[in-house]
Amino acid sequence: MTKKITIIGAGNVGATAAXXAASKDLGDIV
């Protein structure tokens, strides 16, 4: 079972965090 990662907020910080998490395969972005 993969972890679910929720990015709170929008803008560069949220986008960067989501991209980093997705590229590192940390879990599903929800």
From Swiss-Prot:
Biological processes annotated in GO: tricarboxylic acid cycle
SUPFAM superfamilies: NAD(P)-binding Rossmann-fold domains (SSF51735)
Keywords: NAD, Oxidoreductase, Tricarboxylic acid cycle
Binding of NAD(+), residues: G9, A10, G11, N12, V13, G14
Annotated protein name in UniProt: Malate dehydrogenase
Protein family membership: Belongs to the LDH/MDH superfamily. MDH type 3 family.
Function: Catalyzes the reversible oxidation of malate to oxaloacetate.
Gene assigned in the entry: mdh
EC numbers on record: 1.1.1.37
Gene3D superfamilies, per the entry: NAD(P)-binding Rossmann-like Domain
Keyword Oxidoreductase carried by entry: yes
Catalytic activity: (S)-malate + NAD(+) = oxaloacetate + NADH + H(+)
GO MF annotation: an example: L-malate dehydrogenase (NAD+) activity
